A protein has these predicted regions:
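Membrane-embedded alpha-helical bundles of multi-pass transporters/translocases
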Residues: 2-211
Length: 214
């Protein structure tokens, strides 16, 4: 008697993503899955793009203890980001589960995004034990080498985790949902319009917030 293979979480009926109805409605499919969900994720990405360097420079004072790091991390991470995007593409080419091809990666990407954001914006300030020493360290630039190394690791790991793995895992997978969800051309147009509206809305809000605090 052949042994039963253990099913993964994404093979359970709970994660079944196949749409049994013949039509795709504006709500909840398009409204929640293609408009509200993406606009929140894109807004999060926009905030990171706008505020990350300002956070490094103005909040944790990276310019005082590692001025080269603000330039080196994005440049050195370019290759890792390319590899991460290729890896996500390969994962999407695998045999689909009951949850489909894209949904497992979207669900995995969300907690990884949360972890990456924590690493990006909760970086230990070198040599800082309280508010007074944080301020003194930022003013004088007198920081410990050990603290600077730890902060550098946080910044580098958080940056690569977000841009090379977490964000491609969510965004690349979600971008493929339109073609994977339905074969109806008119319904694809509806879903594509919802995604475009989400992109424009998130870009507009993020841009206004960035300009308001420049």
């Amino acid at each position: 008697m052949a042994e039963k293979t253990k099913k993964s979480f994404f093979e359970t009926p709970l994660m079944r993503s196949r749409i049994k109805s013949r039509t795709v409605s504006l709500f909840p499919e398009a409204g929640l899955g293609y408009l509200l969900g993406p606009v929140l994720a894109l807004f999060c990405n926009g905030v990171v793009n706008i505020w990350l360097v300002q956070y490094w420079h103005n909040v944790i004072g990276m310019g005082s203890w590692a001025p080269w790091l603000e330039t080196v991390i994005p440049l050195a991470s370019a290759v890792i980001i390319i590899i991460g995007n290729l890896l996500v593409g390969r994962l999407m080419e695998r045999k689909p589960s009951l949850a489909g091809k894209a949904r497992p990666l979207i669900l995995l990407g969300m907690p990884i995004i949360a972890v990456a954001l924590v690493l990006l914006f909760i970086i230990p300030v070198p040599g800082a034990a309280n508010e007074e020493t944080i301020l003194q360290g930022l003013i004088t630039g007198q920081t410990s080498m050990e603290g600077g190394l730890l902060a550098s690791i946080f910044a580098a790991v958080g940056y690569n985790l977000f841009y090379a793995f977490a964000w491609p895992m969510y965004y690349t997978s979600h971008s493929a949902l339109v073609n994977l969800s339905t074969r109806d051309g008119s319904k694809r147009g509806l879903l594509g319009t919802a995604i475009m509206a989400a992109q424009l809305g998130a870009a507009g809000v993020s841009g206004k917030i960035g300009r308001a605090h420049v």
